[in-house]
Structure formats: structure tokens, C-alpha cells
């Protein structure tokens, strides 16, 4: 048996223990995990500093460095997030259907854990803690395979979380961190359909394509966020600028940050100069079509690649469009089914935008940055699914369970 298969088998065995834990036991476990992160803060931050030094040596971009970096505040927020997850309602055992059939059988549909989930991700060490906590809260075993750029941070975080499992008299193999960064090891992991029930890739386009093409296990992709804001002719200009500033500048490396601004031609002469002036203090580089460049001479002429790009940086592509339909056509061509925003005072245009787009999250007069599990009331998320399956959009605890039927009778037969 190969090493990676052995680890997956251990995780599957441990997952059976997790599946039977009471809600209270899981709450105490996650609180202990949060305390372990606080206790190991110095070790985790030192490991992260080493990862950052290595990343700078390799001259990685500022967006990657931002996703990779931890500081005392971010680490404290990670621990607090685990406490928040501990306090969430337990989805396991929830009855979603309860029906007494005419023949007397009692039919229930009940949430149960998926089993073992493999999370393959890049850069963000907070995902190590968040994904582990969410999967464990839902009664699942978790196999984590982070990126090489965060390997030291991930080892330090996983070590703290595994210690909490031991303190709870649970097998630490309920949480496996794959430390072999070789591509062939990840490829082998993706073949283990008898031991792993779901793979969730979260990272760059290359990683997600590799996982989708090679996995023999069901995959829920967390694809790039090419998010748009369309400013309709009837939009409140002050509101549109406020949403633009929030969506583009508060955390440009986030997947729910805006990448493209679409502007109705009737409002463009009034809106775009004001928007450009509002963005200037934040250092946002603008790239626009010919019509935009006519209104804003300092703007760089955009290419097709600009409209398809997930910049994760202070860069914004702009296009002026004649109507809502043209905005929808642009989004269908260049978007990634993540999050789209319309700013409008026209209810009919808002309804058209919502009904004709199939993106995971559609906002009407609200910031793209609300495309987040916590902001949408899920409490926490393992990521934002762009795969049109049962889990679409921010994935909370419910999405890490499945529903099965439990039927009780008194000897009834079908025929």
C-alpha cells in the first residue's frame, strides 16, 4: 500500500468516529482547536514568516503575498472563526423531509456526513483551519493538500489542530495534511475513489483544471472570480461609486473582488469621470475599451485578455455597453459564474439581470464583497462553488453533508 493510500485509509477509518460524535462533543473539539491555535501562535507566525521569506525570494506577486501572510490579528481571527463554527447549528441529523405515506411507512430525509473530503488549495493558510473545522463540524474526515508556498504554515497549523484531536481522545488521522508536494502524489490522491468522497479544489485556474481533468472522485470546483459590476442608466451615481470602491479596493486579492466594470452608455459621461477620480487615491489602474478611453484619456486600452482576467490586484477593466442585454452578453462571454452586481433603480432591469444570469451569486444594489458565507448568513464557508451542483455559491455546513432516506414500517411490502 502506498503512503498516500495509507493516509487516506486512516482518514476514512477516523471519519467513522467523527460521524457519530454528538453536537456537544464537536463543539468542545472545535473550541479546543481554537485554543490550540492561540497557544501555538508564536510557532505558526514563525513558520509563516519563513514561508513569506521564501516567497519573496521567488519574487511572487503582491496578491499571492497577501493571501499567504499571517499576522497576530489574522491568526486571532482564524481562532475566532473556529469558535464561530463551533457555535453553528449542527447539520448532521437534521430532518429535511418527514412524511407518513398512505401505506403506513414513515419516510424521513436526514442529513448525514459525506465521509472523507479532500481539499486541494493554494497560498491561503487560513483555509487549513477553516476547512478542517467545517468538515469536522459536519462529521467528515478531511485530507488537506495546500500549496508548497504555505507548507511551513500549514504544518504548524495542522499540528496544533491534530493535538486538539488527541486531547479529545479522537484519532488525529481525522485530519491529514499531505506534506509531499510532488505532483504525482496529488495525482494519486485524486484516484482514490474508494476512500475519498469529494474533492474541492480552490486556487488558480491551472490547479483547478488539473484536478477536474484527473480526478476519479466527484469534484466541486471553486473557480476564479471574474466578478462584474454593471452600472445601469438609472443608477444612483453615488451608490455605484460606493459599491465600486468597496468591491475593488477593500481586498483586491479576494475572489469576490470586482474585476470588470460595465457602464451603460447613457450614464457613462457622468459616471466614469467621477468613478475614476474616486479610484485614483487607491492606485487602481484602469483598462478600458475605445469609448472609455475617449472619456478617460489616461486609461490603457483593454484587450480581450483583460476582460477574462482575474487580476486579484488593483486593476480594473471597463467597458461601455448600450443596454442590459449587452452587459449580460459580456458577462456570459467573460465571466466565471462567480458573482455579478447590477446597480439600478429600474426593477425590470434588475429582474432581467437576476433571471438571465446563472452565476452563483447575483447582487442588486449591493457590493460583490457580500459574496461570502459569513455575510450571507451561512456562518462560515469552505469556499465558493462555481460548479452547478447541489452546492452552488458559498458552501456552508449543509453543503458538506448529504441527505439520505430513512424509512420505518411495520412489515409493509410493495406488492
UniProtKB/Swiss-Prot annotation:
MF GO annotations: glutamate-5-semialdehyde dehydrogenase activity; NADP binding
Gene: proA
Keywords recorded for this protein, A-Z: Amino-acid biosynthesis, Cytoplasm, NADP, Oxidoreductase, Proline biosynthesis
GO cellular component: cytoplasm
Signal peptide: none
Record's subcellular location: Cytoplasm
UniProt EC number: 1.2.1.41
GO terms (BP aspect): L-proline biosynthetic process
Classification via NCBIfam families: PRK00197.1, proA
Keyword Oxidoreductase applies: yes
Main location: cytoplasm
Associated pathway: Amino-acid biosynthesis; L-proline biosynthesis; L-glutamate 5-semialdehyde from L-glutamate: step 2/2
Domain of life: Bacteria
Keyword hit for Cell wall biogenesis/degradation: no
Source species taxonomy: Bacteria, Pseudomonadati, Pseudomonadota, Gammaproteobacteria, Lysobacterales
UniProt similarity note: Belongs to the gamma-glutamyl phosphate reductase family.
UniProt cross-references to InterPro entries, sorted A to Z: Ald_DH/histidinol_DH, Ald_DH_C, Ald_DH_N, Aldehyde_DH_dom, G-glutamylP_reductase_CS, Glu-5-SA_DH, GPR_dom
Protein name: Gamma-glutamyl phosphate reductase
Catalytic activity: L-glutamate 5-semialdehyde + phosphate + NADP(+) = L-glutamyl 5-phosphate + NADPH + H(+)
Function: Catalyzes the NADPH-dependent reduction of L-glutamate 5-phosphate into L-glutamate 5-semialdehyde and phosphate. The product spontaneously undergoes cyclization to form 1-pyrroline-5-carboxylate.
Gene3D superfamilies: Aldehyde Dehydrogenase, Chain A, domain 1, Aldehyde Dehydrogenase, Chain A, domain 2
Amino acid at each position: 500500500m502506498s503512503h498516500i493510500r495509507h493516509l487516506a485509509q486512516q482518514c476514512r477509518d477516523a471519519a467513522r468516529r467523527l460521524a457519530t460524535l454528538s453536537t456537544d462533543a464537536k463543539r468542545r473539539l472545535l473550541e479546543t482547536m481554537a485554543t490550540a491555535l492561540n497557544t501555538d501562535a508564536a510557532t505558526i507566525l514563525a513558520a509563516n514568516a519563513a514561508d513569506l521569506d521564501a516567497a519573496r525570494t521567488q519574487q511572487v506577486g503582491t496578491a499571492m503575498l497577501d493571501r499567504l501572510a499571517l499576522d497576530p490579528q489574522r491568526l486571532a481571527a482564524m481562532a475566532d472563526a473556529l469558535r464561530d463554527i463551533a457555535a453553528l447549528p449542527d447539520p448532521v441529523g437534521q430532518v429535511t423531509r418527514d412524511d407518513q405515506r398512505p401505506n403506513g411507512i414513515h419516510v424521513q430525509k436526514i442529513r448525514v456526513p459525506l465521509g472523507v473530503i479532500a481539499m486541494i488549495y493554494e497560498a491561503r493558510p487560513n483555509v487549513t483551519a477553516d476547512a478542517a473545522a467545517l468538515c469536522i463540524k459536519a462529521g467528515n474526515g478531511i485530507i488537506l493538500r495546500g500549496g508548497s508556498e504555505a507548507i511551513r504554515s500549514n504544518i504548524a497549523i495542522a499540528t496544533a489542530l491534530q493535538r486538539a484531536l488527541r486531547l479529545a481522545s479522537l484519532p488525529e488521522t481525522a485530519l491529514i495534511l499531505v506534506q509531499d508536494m510532488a505532483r504525482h502524489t496529488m495525482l494519486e490522491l485524486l484516484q482514490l475513489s474508494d476512500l475519498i468522497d469529494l474533492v474541492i479544489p480552490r486556487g488558480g485556474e491551472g490547479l483547478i483544471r488539473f484536478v477536474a481533468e484527473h480526478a476519479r472522485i466527484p469534484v466541486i470546483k471553486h473557480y476564479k472570480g471574474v466578478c462584474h459590476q454593471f452600472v445601469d442608466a438609472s443608477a444612483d451615481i453615488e451608490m455605484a461609486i460606493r459599491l465600486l470602491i468597496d468591491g475593488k479596493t477593500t481586498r483586491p486579492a479576494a475572489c469576490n473582488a470586482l474585476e470588470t466594470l460595465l457602464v451603460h452608455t447613457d450614464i457613462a459621461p457622468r459616471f466614469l469621470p467621477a468613478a475614476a477620480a474616486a479610484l485614483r487615491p487607491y492606485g487602481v489602474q484602469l483598462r478600458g475599451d475605445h469609448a472609455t478611453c475617449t472619456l478617460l484619456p489616461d486609461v490603457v486600452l483593454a484587450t480581450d485578455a483583460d476582460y477574462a482576467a482575474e487580476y486579484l490586484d488593483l486593476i480594473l477593466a471597463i467597458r461601455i455597453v448600450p443596454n442590459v442585454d449587452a452587459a449580460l452578453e459580456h458577462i456570459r462571454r467573460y465571466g466565471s459564474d462567480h458573482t455579478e452586481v447590477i446597480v439600478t433603480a429600474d426593477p425590470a432591469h434588475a429582474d432581467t439581470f437576476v433571471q438571465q444570469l446563472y452565476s452563483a451569486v447575483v447582487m442588486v444594489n449591493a457590493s460583490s464583497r457580500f459574496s461570502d458565507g459569513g455575510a450571507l448568513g451561512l456562518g462560515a464557508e469552505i469556499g465558493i462553488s462555481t460548479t452547478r451542483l447541489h452546492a452552488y455559491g458559498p458552501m456552508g455546513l449543509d453543503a458538506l453533508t448529504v441527505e439520505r432516506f430513512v424509512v420505518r414500517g411495520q412489515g409493509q411490502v410493495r406488492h
